Amino acid sequence: MGDSRETHGLNAFVTGYPVKHSRSPLIHGYWLRTLNLAGSYRAVEVTPDDFPAFIAALKDRSSGFVGGNVTIPHKEIAFKLADRPDELSEELGASNTLWLEDGLLHATNTDGRGFTANLDECHPGWDRTDRAVILGAGGASRAVIQAVRDRGVNEIHVVNRTVERAQELSDRFGAQVHAHPMAALGEVMRSAGLFVNTTSLGMENEVAPTIDFSPLAENAVVTDIVYVPLKTPLLAQAEEQGFATVDGLGMLLHQAAPGFETWFGKRPVVDEVLRALIIADMDKHR
């Protein structure tokens, strides 16, 4: 997606409803400063009713934006309104990154790339396993399943309270994705090398269940796409039981990088200074 376009005065956005909570302006603002670029990135709150008009203004360039990020609840409609959604978006039915190119609105979904880049950075070799367990079958699980499958994991077991939701994902992503009810969690965890929580269990004000991680492979990695709190109860449990853990903040940071490079023409770096900046903001808003 990257190119060498002139970066003076380019403007990008994040839109959602609501969008006040988004930390994307902090992330992209940091990269603009450290790379000494003249562009801007800001949050624009758009209601579902107004979203088609927002996209129309983006397409005809009257909005002044070259592209941007899309968050809840607009990801599905952004995919539908794009002129050129890529294969990742097509399979997911949702897009989180938009950009104008040759007069057309292109779309992709970088959530899966953010997920795998976080694991690559924090626990290289995580993808040597043949078996992964994904807890949850909501919208957030789709990109994770897609990314894990595309990295060559042969068996992906989706466990959900409502097994029908998990079955829908199995139908969408192919024969190597298997659906299970919560009662089967312990059984499907046997010898799995990756455990991913994609649910809100363990978020602030959420009571997390106690999970016995011992059926996992000895060198398994447990990760959570939730990053508030940074160490969720599920990660704390896994750590106490001797397993390697990876928090979800890196996914947020890494999923932002492809879009930035597309809009501003420079590849940003996810570093410890950026991570500390976001953690400080999280602490401030507790």
From Swiss-Prot:
GO CC list: cytosol
UniProt keyword terms in alphabetical order: Amino-acid biosynthesis, Aromatic amino acid biosynthesis, NADP, Oxidoreductase
Active site per database record: 75 (proton acceptor)
Keyword field contains Secreted: no
GO-annotated molecular function: NADP binding; shikimate 3-dehydrogenase (NADP+) activity
Binding residues for NADP(+): 87, 136-140, 160-165, 225, 248
InterPro entries membership: Aminoacid_DH-like_N_sf (IPR046346), NAD(P)-bd_dom_sf (IPR036291), SDH_C (IPR041121), Shikimate_DH (IPR011342), Shikimate_DH-bd_N (IPR013708), Shikimate_DH_fam (IPR022893), Shikm_DH/Glu-tRNA_Rdtase (IPR006151)
Enzyme Commission numbers on file: 1.1.1.25
Binding residue positions for shikimate: 22-24, 71, 96, 111, 227
Keyword Cell membrane attributed: no
Domain of life (superkingdom): Bacteria
One Pfam family named in its UniProt record: Shikimate_DH
Name of the protein described by the UniProt record: Shikimate dehydrogenase (NADP(+))
Annotated metabolic or biological route of this protein: Metabolic intermediate biosynthesis; chorismate biosynthesis; chorismate from D-erythrose 4-phosphate and phosphoenolpyruvate: step 4/7
